[in-house]
From Swiss-Prot:
This is Chromosomal replication initiator protein DnaA. The gene is dnaA. Coiled coil: none annotated. Oligomerizes as a right-handed, spiral filament on DNA at oriC. Domain I is involved in oligomerization and binding regulators, domain II is flexibile and of varying length in different bacteria, domain III forms the AAA+ region, while domain IV binds dsDNA. PROSITE patterns: DNAA. It is found in: Cytoplasm.
């Protein structure tokens, strides 16, 4: 059986799955042909078990349909083709969220050939393989006293003898306790906690990606703060990628590149934000490539963030993209309504402000793009409340966020939703308003109605009237139907998510 057949079937499966599922579970798989048998390699036990349970049956069907029609011989193994260095499922306890949703991982370091034992497809025993670790993290096995609080951000200088001095800022308020968890960030939070609590057995590198203001930086700081809580002597360095570039340029100017290398390669944990700024900076990428390799070979933790999936960063060398996939890559999605409400309630509680639940719900319904804008809106409301000497009510919120709400209403109108949905499904707006019931029109119409209910303040009768004079029960049925399909139909779920993102950003 050929590898080409496998690739053909994987492409067919790509069309059936949401992009995030495909990138998380199928993309990391490697394959090689051994006679009539296909050997499929998963990077670790979790990916293997998940693929076995969720996708193996469909893959075998596709292989049979597109091959000889006979069920193929296929083995699932842990490792990588051509015997890459051994990788392991961690010894430490793994949260259910991580176990259920491990992201784009590939085999770790290249090393002398090591045999990869086949794993029975239905097996579930833990697989333990050697991993290297850094002795300085051994001290984290027992909790230590937390470092003294220093306001919002702690100025913490980490110095290596004979090397550059670099001051790293960890925001002491960005902790796991202050992070509001929801469906959109559950996996990212679980993975970050695993790294923070078990630095010798976590995922390296941990790569978090997603839009602006979704909590990636918060989680990165939370990991750093937790590492320092467990071991105040740990050398934890947080910086923006532009700081790395600036340090390198300065080192070159001072003829101190060796000191620069010594500093960055001696830390216990390196946390770099917005890695996409390395794009098209060839010398910076070259230096970071070697720094990254040195850190992982020493068992030192690396955490990176970006505004997009690493493979999609243009101007970034392929070898870096490949290495970023060695560990765990996790998407952070925009928060859903319930999470937005929880964030507002928590922020109000931290500010010792009474925020009625209906007021939080009102703000959360209208500010949808990211957490940063949500917090900014709440700060405006609180300030307005203090200045006016009034309690926070929906009326006060309307006054304090008047310009912002007007902009949101302008951006997200039923007309705009209809136009966006029609363009997405390549139909006419008149089709959405017509009486046609063919699936190619009826389903987009239901999607548009559901989006109108979620994104606007119109009542069901008003929405129905704007969709060709339909009854409010038709709109209610459409909303319920789309909510059901989002749970069972991958295509509808992906369509809805794409349209929601387009309409709210």
């Amino acid at each position: 059986m050929s590898v080409e057949l496998w690739q053909q079937c994987v492409e067919l499966l790509r069309d059936e799955l949401p992009a995030q599922q495909f990138n998380t579970w199928i993309r990391p798989l490697q394959v090689e042909a051994e006679g009539d048998e296909l050997r499929v390699y998963a990077p670790n036990r979790f990916v293997l078990d998940w693929v076995n349970e969720k996708y193996l049956g469909r893959l075998l069907e596709l292989l049979g349909e597109n091959g000889s029609g006979i069920a193929p011989a296929l083995s699932l193994l842990i490792g990588s083709r051509r015997s890459s260095a051994p990788r392991a499922a961690p010894n430490a306890p793994v949260s259910a969220a991580v176990a259920a949703s491990l992201a784009q991982t590939q085999a770790h370091k290249t090393a002398p050939a090591a045999a990869v034992e086949p794993v029975a497809v239905a097996a579930a025993e833990p697989v333990l393989v050697e991993t290297s670790s850094r002795d300085s993290f051994d001290a984290m096995a027992e909790p230590a006293a937390a470092p003294p609080s220093g306001g919002r951000a702690e100025q913490r200088t980490v110095q290596v003898e004979g090397a550059l001095k670099h001051t790293s800022y960890l925001n002491r308020t960005f902790t796991f306790d202050t992070f509001v968890e929801g469906k959109s960030n559950q996996l990212a939070r679980a993975a970050a906690w695993q790294v923070a609590d078990n630095p010798k057995h976590g995922y390296n590198p941990l790569f978090l990606y997603g839009g602006v203001g979704l909590g990636k930086t918060h989680l990165m700081h939370a990991v750093g703060n937790h590492l320092l809580k467990k071991n105040p002597n740990a050398k934890v360095v947080y910086l923006h990628s532009e700081r790395f570039v600036a340090d390198m340029v300065k080192a070159l100017q001072l003829n101190a590149i060796n000191e620069f290398k010594r500093f960055y390669r001696s830390v216990d944990a390196l946390l770099i934000d917005d890695i996409q700024f390395f794009a098209r900076k060839e010398r910076s990428q070259e230096e970071f490539f070697h720094t990254f390799n040195a850190l992982l070979e020493g068992g030192q933790q690396v955490i990176l963030t970006s505004d997009r999936y690493p493979k999609e960063i243009e101007g970034l060398e392929e070898r870096l993209k490949s290495r970023f996939g060695w560990g765990l890559t996790v998407a952070v999605e925009p928060p859903e309504l319930e999470t937005r409400v929880a964030i507002l309630m928590k922020k109000a509680d931290q500010a010792k402000v009474e925020l009625p639940h209906d007021a939080a719900f009102f703000i959360a319904q209208r500010i949808r793009s990211n957490v940063r804008e949500l917090e900014g809106a709440l700060k405006r409301v609180i300030a307005h409340s203090h200045f006016m000497g009034r309690d926070i009510t929906i009326e006060l919120i309307r006054e304090s966020l008047k310009d912002l709400l007007a902009l949101q209403d302008k951006l997200v109108s039923v007309d705009n939703i209809q136009r966006t949905v029609a363009e997405y499904y390549k139909i006419k707006i008149s089709d959405l308003l017509s009486k046609r019931r063919s699936r190619s029109v009826a389903r987009p119409r239901q999607v548009a109605m559901a989006l109108s209910k979620e994104l606007t303040n119109h009542s069901l009768p008003e929405i129905g009237d704007m969709f060709g004079g339909r009854d409010h029960t038709t709109v209610l049925h459409a909303c319920r139907k789309i909510n059901e399909l989002k749970e069972s139909d991958a295509d509808i779920r992906e369509d809805y998510k794409n349209l929601l993102r387009t309409l709210t950003t």
